[in-house]
C-alpha cells in the first residue's frame, strides 16, 4: 500500500458520522490536492469495513461511485442523518466535514 493510499484511509476514517467530504477535500487533506480522481479509485476499490467510504462524495454533493451500489451508499448516509435526494446530498454546507475550519465560540448574552 502506497503512502498516499495510507494517508487517504487515515483521512477517511476521521470523517465523523453524519458528515461527508469530497474526493477533492480528501485528496487535499492527504497532501495531494490534485488527486481527487485517485481518491475516487481508492474508495471504489476499498473493501475495508473500518473505512467509511460512503462518506466520501463527488463535488457539488453528487454521490459519486461506491464499491457497493449507489442505493447502499444512499441508505448508509441516510442512516447517519445525511439527507440525500436523488443522487445528491442536501444541506451540503451543514454536513460537509472540514477539519481545517476552526470553530468559533459564541459568546453568551
Regions found by a protein language model. Name each.
Residues 1-109:
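Nucleic acid-binding interface residues in structured DNA/RNA-binding domains
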Amino acid at each position: 500500500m502506497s503512502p498516499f493510499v495510507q494517508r487517504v484511509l487515515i483521512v477517511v476514517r476521521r470523517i465523523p458520522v453524519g458528515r461527508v467530504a469530497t474526493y477533492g477535500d480528501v485528496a487535499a487533506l492527504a497532501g495531494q490536492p490534485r488527486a481527487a480522481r485517485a481518491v475516487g479509485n481508492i474508495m471504489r476499490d476499498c473493501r475495508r469495513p473500518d473505512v467509511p467510504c460512503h462518506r466520501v462524495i463527488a463535488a457539488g454533493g453528487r454521490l459519486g461511485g461506491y464499491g457497493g451500489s449507489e442505493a447502499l451508499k444512499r441508505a448508509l448516509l441516510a442512516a447517519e442523518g445525511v439527507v440525500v435526494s436523488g443522487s445528491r446530498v442536501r444541506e451540503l454546507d451543514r454536513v460537509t466535514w472540514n477539519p481545517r475550519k476552526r470553530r468559533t465560540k459564541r459568546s453568551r448574552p
